[in-house]
From Swiss-Prot:
Provenance organism: Campylobacter fetus subsp. fetus (strain 82-40)
Listed name of the protein: Homoserine kinase
EC number of this enzyme: 2.7.1.39
Residues that coordinate or bind ATP: 84-94
Pfam families linked to this entry: GHMP_kinases_N (PF00288)
Amino acid sequence: MKILTPATSANLGPGFDSLGLSLKLYNEVTITKQNFTSVCISGEGSDKIGLKKNNTFVNIFNETMLYLTGKTPNFRFNFINNIPFSRGLGSSSSVIVGAIASAYHMAGFKVDRALVLNQALKYESHPDNISPAVWGGFTSNIVHKGTVYTQKADISSDLRAVVVIPDKPTSTKQSRGKLPKTYPMADVISNVSHAAFLTACFIKQDYENLRLASIDKMHEIRRMHGLKELFRVREIAYLSGALMSNLSGSGSSFLNLAHKDRAQTLRDILQLEFPEFKVEIYELDNNGFILQS
């Protein structure tokens, strides 16, 4: 079997730990039965010997298989990693979701997406990345009494994500450490209102209001100071037709949404201005993970 699990972009400005969307950029894992366990990696992480000896996907897959069947059979895992590591594009969520969903499939169980999502919460306590990897599209999420609840909206095929990917990785843990423990009431109210408005914009596909809706007062500026070029990325993106321009997850990547007829121009302008960074265009994914027998 093969599973494709998409990259995700979380927070989307004011939706800290609660909003996210899914990109057509996939990690692929092919799993076949054999007499011993083996791991083959190409793409991201292929030069890291430790990923073969202590592989998070394999570990979570085996934990899930043991839970479901009481056994951990041997398999060959062939990874094609396309999602950059530590760039705020949900590489870890892709691993977690992919491992759990594929274990259910290989164990002969029906793959229930809501169940996969809630199993994933054991490994990733914030649903803004794992939810779009499961459901696709734009997702608004809450966790209530240990259970994730999601509302999903499909994203128009007219939109493209123009993603600036710096050469500098970001640690989510370190990035969170830059944030204060308390916030002024006015900033909290601003984020709540903007997150609600942003959600309505995606549901109604009112993309012309995304720039206003995606204003954040709680985390982006503090995180962006770690890579000050990102302030210029946003400035240029808006001058060049972006509908919204926000830090992707905790960074270091920057997500810019644009109409597809503006995406290539926006990409070229950003690449010219930031030759040291990668700038890629992705379609938006509305399906979440894909299982292929």
